Swiss-Prot record:
It comes from Cutibacterium acnes (strain DSM 16379 / KPA171202) (Propionibacterium acnes). One of its GO terms (biological process) is translation. Belongs to the bacterial ribosomal protein bL33 family. It comes from the Bacteria. Keywords: Ribonucleoprotein, Ribosomal protein. The keyword Cell division does not apply. Signal peptide: none annotated. Pfam families: Ribosomal_L33. Transmembrane segments: none annotated. This is Large ribosomal subunit protein bL33A. InterPro entries: Ribosomal_bL33, Ribosomal_bL33_CS, Ribosomal_bL33_sf, Ribosomal_zn-bd. PANTHER family: 50S RIBOSOMAL PROTEIN L33, CHLOROPLASTIC, LARGE RIBOSOMAL SUBUNIT PROTEIN BL33C. One of its GO terms (cellular component) is ribosome.
Amino acid sequence: MAKKSGDVRPKITLACTECKERNYITKKNRRNNPDRMEMAKFCPRCRKHTAHRETR
């Protein structure tokens, strides 16, 4: 079966705001968080904790 494009829990990619490397893949609930997600995560390229923002 094919997945719906308007899925409630889509996979999203989190990219580092400093070096722009895409480090993490996670899921989010579109009903609870309709805007772009931002989290503090460890970036192995920067070697420190930075803000990671959802990419399209």
